[in-house]
Structure formats: structure tokens, C-alpha cells
């Protein structure tokens, strides 16, 4: 796992085995095996890359598969055809299968809802009006860029008005998520347990850490992509050590892969990545071999907002695809018509 490009076997040998082979090159070998925990991490093209190594031509060429995957947004029943095609080539083992790991505790996942504050409601309504006017006069690549940018703004606003506005302060009462975070973490503190708080935004890691320090009455830790490798190792060792370090705030990308943080048995996704595979990888920093307690996972959502509606749509997609298709990021949202987008963005109180 430490050497994802390591190839076991030589060119021209009987068998090649690759680990995490999302960017594979042609190798001359008769038998091929790929080991991966996330066959589809960000987009369907990940799956095509794997099968282009395993069985070239099975899923067509890259352009053909791209056209096919685009159609799935409008015709989800096509997932069943794809599942049927690739099923004979996949041997899947889940950690939750007791025949695979007999002593792994339970994972309890729940959606945790927060109400917007009055300030958030006002800003949300203003942002919706602004976006409506903007997308009406744009098209093509520019329109898609505006939609993705708008989604980011909504996420920031749903986290905290100060994150969206780029101001300081981060008052608790101005964010429904901060209020819910206190409620959950006070219970964790009473039990002297530990929690991982994931966010996709580096800029809110420090405000979250300061807020949590007030709840736990002691300092926690922060881990994001800007922290040097040497310090990252010390940070992980400190969290996993015998001293009570109650929390770690992590950026989703920096903390999503390759870390062992089993001292925590609570995981909070403060904002959503909208990709089940990425979120599950982050959760698995705590829910993995070595964990002795049941792991409780909270996925924060603000009620009546774009967060709640996208989550509902993804649940429906997940049921249709039955986990063969993890996600296409947020790009599928950019293909929506104007009226569909406005219905997605509108605030329902």
C-alpha cells in the first residue's frame, strides 16, 4: 500500500498484480489482477481505466465509455447493464462481512440535520436570486463553471456565514451546524471518547478546532494538505497515543487515505463531498482493523437547502446503481436545466 505503483511480476511474465491501479500502463502478461478499495473514486472513468488494463476493449474505448456514462444521468437503468457486464470480473470483500473480519465492531451511520440561522436564511435567499439571474444569461462551459462555483458558495454558507463572507468571528449561534456540533461533542466529551471532524475546506479547519477546544476544554489537532509530512506523522502518533486528545479536524482529501486513527470512534462529516467513495474512505480512518468500539458516523445536512436535496438524489442514485457507480462528483448537476437547478437551489423552510 505504501508503493501504489509497485508491480508484482515482470514484463512478459505469467501474472501481473497491481495495487490501486487507477493509472495503469500496458504490460505484457497473460494474467492480470488489480486490488483496490475504491474502483470508482471520483468518476466512472476510473472504472474504465481498470478494465482497460484487465480486459482491454470490454468497455469500449475511452470516448465511447464517456458517451455511455453521460447517458446514465438521464437513464439510470443503464447501470444494470454495466453491472451485468463487469460482475464476472469482480471479487468483492467487505469489512462488514464477518467471514472476512470477525472482530470488527459495528458502524452506525446517520444523517444529522441542522436548521439555518436567521443570518444564513437571509444570505441564502440573496444568493439564490443572484444565481438565478446569472445562469439565465450564460451557457456552455461558462454556465457549468458558474454552477459549480455556486454549489461551493452554498456549501460554505451552510457551514457558517463567516466562511461564505470571508470574515472572522464564527459565532456559534450564527450557524445551525455549529449548534449541532456542540450538542454531539458534549456527549462525546462526557464519555471521554474521541472524534474526527472532516471538512473539504481548509479555511474552516482552524475555526472548527478553536470551537471544539472550548467544548472539550483542551486542545485538539488539525490535519490538512498544508502540513509537512514529518509533522503529519507526529500529529497522528499524538492522536493515537495514550494521552486524551479529544478531537482532530481534517481536510477530507488530506485525511481521507492511508491514515490509522482508530482511537476515534466518532466521525463527523461537517460538510459533504457528494461522493460516497471519498466519504467512506475518510470514515475508514476510524472504522478499520484495530478499532475496538462501535463507530458512530454523523453526516451533517442543513434542512431545506441544496445539501438536503442533493443528498436525497444521491440516495436514489445509490439504490439504482447498488454501489457499482459511486459518483460522478458534482458534474452531473451542471447538466440540469435552469428550472431544475432553481428547484435544487431554492430554500424550503
Model-derived features: positions:
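Conserved Helicase C-terminal RecA-like lobe
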Residues: 98-120, 125, 138-259, 330-349
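Conserved P-loop NTPase motor "coupling/switch" region that bridges the ATPase
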Residues: 20-100, 291
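A short beta-strand element within the Helicase C-terminal
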Residues: 46-49, 259-272, 295-300
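Single conserved hydrophobic/aromatic residue that forms the stacking wall/gate
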Residues: 1-12, 17
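Conserved nucleotide-binding/hydrolysis micro-motifs of P-loop NTPases
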Residues: 38-44, 56-59, 72-73, 118-121, ...
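Substrate-gripping "pore-loop 1 plus following alpha2 helix"
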Residues: 13-14, 18-24, 276
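A conserved SF2-helicase RecA2
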Residues: 274-283, 287-349
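Short, Asp-centered acidic motifs that coordinate Mg2+ and/or phosphate
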Residues: 31, 246-247, 266
Amino acid at each position: 500500500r505504501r508503493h501504489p505503483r509497485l508491480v508484482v511480476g515482470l514484463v512478459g511474465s505469467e501474472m501481473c498484480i497491481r495495487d490501486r491501479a487507477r493509472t495503469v500502463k500496458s504490460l505484457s502478461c497473460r494474467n492480470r489482477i488489480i486490488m483496490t478499495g475504491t474502483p470508482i473514486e471520483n468518476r466512472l472513468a476510473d472504472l474504465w481505466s481498470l478494465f482497460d488494463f484487465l480486459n482491454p476493449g470490454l468497455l469500449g474505448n475511452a470516448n465511447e465509455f464517456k458517451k455511455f456514462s453521460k447517458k446514465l444521468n438521464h437513464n439510470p437503468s443503464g447501470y444494470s447493464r454495466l453491472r451485468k457486464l463487469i460482475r464476472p470480473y469482480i471479487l468483492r470483500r467487505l469489512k462488514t462481512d464477518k467471514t472476512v473480519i470477525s472482530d470488527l465492531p459495528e458502524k452506525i451511520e446517520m444523517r444529522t440535520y441542522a436548521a439555518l440561522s436567521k443570518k444564513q436564511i437571509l444570505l441564502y435567499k440573496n444568493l439564490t436570486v443572484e444565481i438565478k439571474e446569472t445562469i439565465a444569461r450564460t451557457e456552455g462551459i461558462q454556465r457549468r463553471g458558474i454552477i459549480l462555483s455556486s454549489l461551493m458558495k452554498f456549501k460554505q454558507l451552510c457551514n457558517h456565514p463567516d466562511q461564505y463572507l470571508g470574515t472572522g468571528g464564527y459565532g456559534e449561534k450564527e450557524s445551525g451546524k455549529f449548534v449541532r456540533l456542540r450538542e454531539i461533542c458534549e456527549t462525546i466529551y462526557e464519555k471521554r471518547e474521541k472524534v474526527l471532524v472532516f471538512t473539504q475546506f481548509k479555511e474552516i479547519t482552524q475555526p472548527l478546532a478553536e470551537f471544539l477546544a472550548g467544548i472539550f476544554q483542551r486542545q485538539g489537532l488539525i490535519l490538512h494538505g498544508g502540513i509537512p509530512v514529518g509533522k503529519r506523522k507526529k500529529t497522528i502518533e499524538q492522536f493515537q497515543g495514550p494521552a486524551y486528545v479529544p478531537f482532530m479536524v481534517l481536510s477530507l482529501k488530506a485525511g481521507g487515505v492511508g491514515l490509522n486513527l482508530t482511537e476515534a470512534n466518532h466521525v463527523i462529516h461537517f460538510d459533504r463531498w457528494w461522493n460516497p467513495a471519498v466519504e467512506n474512505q475518510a470514515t475508514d480512518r476510524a472504522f478499520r482493523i484495530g478499532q475496538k468500539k462501535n463507530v458512530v458516523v454523523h453526516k451533517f445536512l442543513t434542512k431545506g437547502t441544496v445539501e438536503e436535496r442533493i443528498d436525497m438524489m444521491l440516495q436514489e442514485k445509490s439504490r439504482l446503481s447498488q454501489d457499482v457507480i459511486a459518483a460522478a462528483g458534482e458534474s452531473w448537476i451542471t447538466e440540469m436545466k435552469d428550472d431544475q437547478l432553481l428547484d435544487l437551489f431554492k430554500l424550503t423552510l
